[in-house]
A protein has these predicted regions:
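Cytosolic catalytic domains that perform sulfur/thiol-centered chemistry
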Residues: 1-202
Length: 202
């Protein structure tokens, strides 16, 4: 997966709490056998409403989603994360995430940023007041910043709450498969030393 160090770009605000994975991508869009091609299903029911935030011109090209609390609850479908990535989001900011959704996000390279509810509200207020607000998510520096323009005065600054191991994996772009392949030579040597009558990994 793609490493994540820092991202500066525009954000959109979705002020809905308890958004479950079926709302993120309905079941009828899960028929693909690949990990791509799910963008059309993202928030499909809500996107039928012309007033929905992702249908607004200012939302085009946004890479950061500011969500309400308890985002990604419900079923364990990985497609919810894949749909967000396919649409172009690299970061989701919320006060709370569903545990399985958060783990799936880390595995796929989507950064789930947990901030205090009041901070999320302040950030959403700024983005809604001025969609051109620039948001920086600096994983390397463990910080979220917002300003009215790139390089301008900082409107908001907040630390990112993330454990060292998860941060390291995202910075390096390592999912479980990539982590295993880092030890490919050791695994091969172990397999070669096993008795022939035992099964091998290959």
């Amino acid at each position: 997966m793609q490493p994540f160090t820092s991202l500066t770009g525009r954000a959109v605000s979705l002020r809905r709490g308890q958004v479950d994975t079926d709302q993120i991508i309905p079941a009828e869009y899960l028929k693909r056998v690949t990990r791509s091609g799910f963008a059309d299903g993202l928030f499909a029911a809500w996107r039928a409403d012309p007033d929905f935030v992702l249908n607004q011109p200012y939302a085009e090209g946004a890479e950061i989603l500011i969500a309400g609390p308890d985002f990604g609850i419900g079923s364990s479908r990985e497609h919810a994360v894949w749909a967000l990535l396919d649409y172009g989001f690299r970061v989701v900011i919320s006060a709370r995430f569903g545990d399985i959704f958060r783990n799936n996000s880390v595995q796929a390279g989507l950064l789930p940023v947990r901030l205090p509810a009041a901070t999320v509200t302040t950030l959403a207020d700024a983005v809604e007041a001025d969609p051109a607000t620039v948001v920086t998510v600096d994983l390397a520096g463990r910080e979220v910043r917002a300003s009215q323009q790139a390089g301008g005065p900082v409107l908001l600054r907040a630390p990112i709450e993330i454990d060292d191991y998860t941060r390291w994996r995202l910075l390096e772009g390592l999912d479980d498969v990539s982590l295993t392949l880092r030890n490919a030579e050791e695994i091969a040597r172990y397999e070669e030393s096993r008795p022939q009558w035992l099964p091998v990994a290959g």
